[in-house]
């Protein structure tokens, strides 16, 4: 885990003088490898702090979130600050209606405390540490299709949780991995495979909750039935399929039209 401090932390292979001497480029420390760059663009940093005191507080929260002693919880766990009954109004009946999965997390974890992992990087995929009924867990949720950067983020988080023995909870609501020329150029297949490999190799207990849509390969990457979760819960309006109905109908129509065109 890497904690970076705004306007103070910098990571790069070569500093401004060497970059200027080697390739003639004028660049500042922040432009080459500042905290904001690594928190939002490269994904090198996991947590972005405002100052040194904030960085120490983040480190303390992280140490508290990891199950170092593997001791079962003693005594009652704190209830969520936000009322779980509000979940009925947060998760929409129409799976196509967007919502923020963080609002769901805030209503199921102890004290509504969620230490988000790479919060400013690839916000389509939400990862972080929390406790549920006193048990420390890692949570992965979706805010739409899984981008290539989201695949990298989720794969790293799963591997870290596996190393620390932290059980994983998956909150599925995705149309699958992002498609299109931009996604392909960004390495959708390569990075998506990393995510699927990570969930396949995770030895910790895995639990899956389908909140909305769960389509295509996204179902695999988010620990669908094929990857042996301890159980799968499904929201009453959840949908699981190879692809959405509208997309399937359009594909079949295009295939039929192409077949008719070939036959004259």
Regions found by a protein language model. Name each.
Residues 1-264:
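Ligand-binding clefts of soluble mixed alpha/beta catalytic domains
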């Amino acid at each position: 885990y890497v904690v970076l401090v705004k306007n103070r932390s910098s990571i790069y292979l070569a500093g401004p003088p060497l970059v200027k001497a080697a390739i003639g480029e004028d660049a500042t420390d922040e432009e080459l490898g500042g905290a904001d760059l690594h928190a939002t663009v490269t994904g090198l940093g996991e947590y972005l702090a405002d100052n040194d005191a904030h960085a120490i507080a983040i480190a303390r929260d992280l140490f508290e979130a990891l199950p170092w002693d593997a001791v079962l919880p003693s005594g009652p766990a704190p209830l969520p600050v936000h009322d779980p009954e509000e979940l009925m109004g947060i998760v929409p009946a129409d799976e196509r209606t967007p919502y923020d999965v963080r609002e769901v997390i805030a209503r199921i974890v102890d004290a509504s405390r969620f230490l988000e992992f790479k919060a400013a990087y690839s916000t389509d995929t939400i990862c972080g540490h929390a406790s549920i009924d006193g048990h420390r867990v890692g949570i992965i949720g979706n805010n739409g299709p899984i981008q290539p950067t989201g695949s990298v983020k989720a794969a790293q988080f799963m591997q870290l949780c596996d190393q620390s023995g932290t059980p994983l909870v998956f909150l599925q609501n995705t149309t699958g991995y992002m498609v299109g020329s931009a996604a392909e150029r960004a390495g959708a297949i390569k990075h998506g495979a990393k995510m699927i490999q990570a969930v396949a190799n995770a030895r910790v207990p895995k639990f899956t909750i389908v909140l909305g849509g769960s389509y295509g390969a996204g179902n695999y990457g988010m620990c669908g039935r094929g990857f042996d979760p301890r159980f799968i819960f499904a929201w009453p309006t959840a949908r699981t399929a190879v692809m959405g109905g509208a997309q399937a109908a359009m594909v079949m129509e295009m295939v039929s039209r192409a077949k008719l065109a070939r036959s004259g």
